[in-house]
Curated annotation (Swiss-Prot):
Cross-referenced Gene3D superfamilies: DHBP synthase
UniProt site positions, description: Essential for catalytic activity: H136, E174
GO molecular function list: 3,4-dihydroxy-2-butanone-4-phosphate synthase activity; magnesium ion binding; manganese ion binding
Protein name per UniProt: 3,4-dihydroxy-2-butanone 4-phosphate synthase
Pfam families linked to this entry: DHBP_synthase
Binding site residues for D-ribulose 5-phosphate: R37, E38, D42, R150, R151, G152, H153, T154, E174
Purpose: Catalyzes the conversion of D-ribulose 5-phosphate to formate and 3,4-dihydroxy-2-butanone 4-phosphate.
EC number: 4.1.99.12
Keyword Heme among UniProt keywords: no
Keyword Magnesium: yes
Biological processes, Gene Ontology terms: riboflavin biosynthetic process
Binding of Mg(2+) 1, residues: E38
Cofactor: Mg(2+); Mn(2+)
Gene: ribB
Amino acid sequence: MNQSLLSPFGDAITRVEAALTALRAGQGVLVVDDEDRENEGDLIYSAEHLTQEQMALLIRECSGIVCLCLTDERVKQLELPPMVEDNSSQYGTAFTVSIEAKVGVTTGVSAADRVTTIKAAIADDAKPSDLARPGHVYPLRAQPGGVLTRRGHTEGTIDLMKLAGLKPAGVLCEVTNVNGTMARLPEIIAFGEQHKMPVLTIEDIVCYRKSLLEKAS
């Protein structure tokens, strides 16, 4: 990762702390993974603060495949099976079956309907019968251990929510360019400046978590 491009956002610790502040305020953040991995940037919001306007931005400015990152415990609570029995995707992205709220939606695809589905899935008393399957929201199961176990956007999202003191559930979507290609770091930084969103990397989150572990030891 060309960290020099991120220098205006401070060092790794500063970038993570800026992201946590933004998430607590209900704002979005942009997270870029390793260049030798997907080399993509995701726009991430906390699920509990998610608004219809934010969902519309995800649909309009990103790939449109809006994913809901959940802990293993929440996936079990909702009884969401894996999308496939044999996951052969390159990075083992842990999609479950897609979901839809059973109450309060129409076709399920509008920004408002997708927000309703996400709020139903993260409710404290959520139960499997609250959700229809399949639907237009794509849950992702985060690995226990977060980015220290798997350096993916799914784990990065859950780690950020936990570090921010928020409900451990987040919404993400890959940022794309106007021509449909995937946005890389220069375009993601420009997107962040346009929308006043902090930019950070998975490596930043790894460094931040390791620094906390060192302080605790």
